[in-house]
Amino acid sequence: MKLLLWACIVCVAFARKRRFPFIGEDDNDDGHPLHPSLNIPYGIRNLPPPLYYRPVNTVPSYPGNTYTDTGLPSYPWILTSPGFPYVYHIRGFPLATQLNVPPLPPRGFPFVPPSRFFSAAAAPAAPPIAAEPAAAAPLTATPVAAEPAAGAPVAAEPAAEAPVGAEPAAEAPVAAEPAAEAPVGVEPAAEEPSPAEPATAKPAAPEPHPSPSLEQANQ
């Protein structure tokens, strides 16, 4: 049993040495092994290099190259916070802040529904309504010009009453109805010729002469 326990301890110790051969770290505590090799992972926790390393310019500095400063950061994977001015900037290229969409304006009433917010924003449109009384002034001037025109027909109304006064003239024929009754009363006048029948009978006096002739004819 003791031999089995010792065998387990030795296996664990050797396995740890093979898995992490850089247990002894350098004095700077960077996590780099003292004797690195090509088949070991980078660092004990696989962390990026520290930020205080001196930046390295990757552009070759040969004699014909006059543009050696690109302005790029040495560690492009380190991003700056949004809204913070960039330390590294390419000349002739717009800033990232200029490419960003401008933020929306702050709303004065964050808890008010949009319909009420827009109606409250439309409230300043009331001053143009106050200017409408100035437009009503010409309306008051129009009745003044209409009064004389309206008065003239009023003065002409008596002329229109003249036909009303002429109605008695129309009543004159009504008064003539008795004249129409006159023919009714003329009937007695028509009876007057009846007494004149004797006057017509005067020529009829010779009638006895033809009557005998008729009698003779009858005989």
From Swiss-Prot:
Residues 155-204 have a biased composition (Low complexity). The keyword Ribonucleoprotein does not apply. InterPro entries: PRR27. It comes from the Eukaryota. The keyword Secreted applies. This is Proline-rich protein 27. The gene is PRR27. Residues 1-15 form the signal peptide. Keywords: Secreted, Signal. Its main location: secreted.
